[in-house]
Regions:
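A short glycine-rich, His/Asp/Glu-containing loop-to-beta-strand
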Residues: 1-22
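A generic "binding-loop/recognition-motif" signal
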Residues: 11, 20, 30, 49, ...
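Short, surface-exposed secondary-structure edge patches
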Residues: 15, 34, 49-52
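Short, conserved beta-strand element in jelly-roll/cupin
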Residues: 17-19, 30-44
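A cytosolic small-molecule/anion-sensing beta-strand core signal
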Residues: 38-39, 54-55, 73
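Short acidic-glycine-tyrosine-enriched beta hairpin
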Residues: 48-63
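Ligand-binding loop in jelly-roll beta-barrel domains
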Residues: 63-83
Length: 83
């Protein structure tokens, strides 16, 4: 589930909720993406390297680098992309 909270040519803010085992497959974005885990545990893979993200933790996914998101359990995250 995702809900776009704000979007324009320079910025996108989206709330995501994943069930356990749900994922967004590997892709690239034209903007730098800042992810904050709001609840649960997720795995963010950037350039093939996995990072486990817990509630309150954040990570940056650089523009034009392949990345993916996986819900290791129910997982909520806020995604802010700056173009």
């Amino acid at each position: 589930m995702s809900k776009t909270l704000a979007q324009n040519d320079a910025l996108s803010v989206t709330l995501f909720a994943f069930d356990k085992g749900e994922e967004i497959s590997t892709h690239e974005s034209g903007g730098d993406a800042f992810v904050t885990c709001l609840d649960g545990t997720g795995r963010i893979t950037i350039d093939g390297v996995p990072y486990e993200l817990h509630e309150g933790e954040s990570i940056v996914m650089p523009a034009r680098h392949p990345h993916a998101v996986y819900g290791q359990e129910q997982f909520k995250m806020l995604l802010v992309v700056v173009f």
